[in-house]
From Swiss-Prot:
Taxonomic placement: Bacteria, Bacillati, Actinomycetota, Actinomycetes, Mycobacteriales
Native species: Mycobacterium bovis (strain ATCC BAA-935 / AF2122/97)
Name of the molecule in the record: Uncharacterized protein Mb0050
Biased composition (Polar residues): 125-137
A Pfam family hit: DUF5318
Superkingdom to which the source organism belongs: Bacteria
Region spans: Disordered: 116-137
InterPro entries: DUF5318
Length: 137
């Protein structure tokens, strides 16, 4: 999901004065550290302070991830997690390390596809072409 319209609307409120800068420049220290160590520089300049390029931070969430869920991950780590775990959500946040602007940019799902389950009632019993049981049964 792309959050471009929501971002545009929020920035319009800030530029018009209806929403204060302190309300949108509220990145916590954990997010700022994640931007420093796990973030990927973007080409977009901060829409609030216009002093630096924004950093993109990817957060992962999923019940099968265990302790990894709720943490920031690099692009390389996302690829590795996608091969090891079933579906999990990735939320990408843009962060300005100067003024603390942060906003959810997009979210998507990654993960290894689960193998198809046999149809219900098949019980895993193999049958010959005419419906008779096979010799291995």
């Amino acid at each position: 999901m792309d959050y471009t319209l929501r971002r545009r609307s929020l920035l319009a409120e800030v530029y018009s004065g209806r929403t204060g800068v302190s309300e949108v420049c509220d990145a916590n220290p954990y997010l700022l550290r994640a931007a420093k160590f796990h973030g990927k520089p973007s080409r977009v300049i901060c829409p609030i302070c216009r002093k630096e390029q924004l950093t993109l931070v990817s957060w992962v969430f999923g019940e099968h991830l265990g302790a990894v869920s709720g943490s920031a991950r690099t692009a390389e780590e996302l690829i590795l997690l996608a091969t090891r775990f079933s579906e999990f959500a990735v939320h990408v946040v843009e962060v300005c390390r100067t003024c603390s602007w942060n906003h959810l940019v997009k979210s998507y799902v990654l993960g290894a596809a689960r193998p198809a389950r046999p149809p219900r009632g098949s019980g895993g019993t193999r049958t010959a072409r005419n419906g008779a049981r096979t010799a291995s049964e």
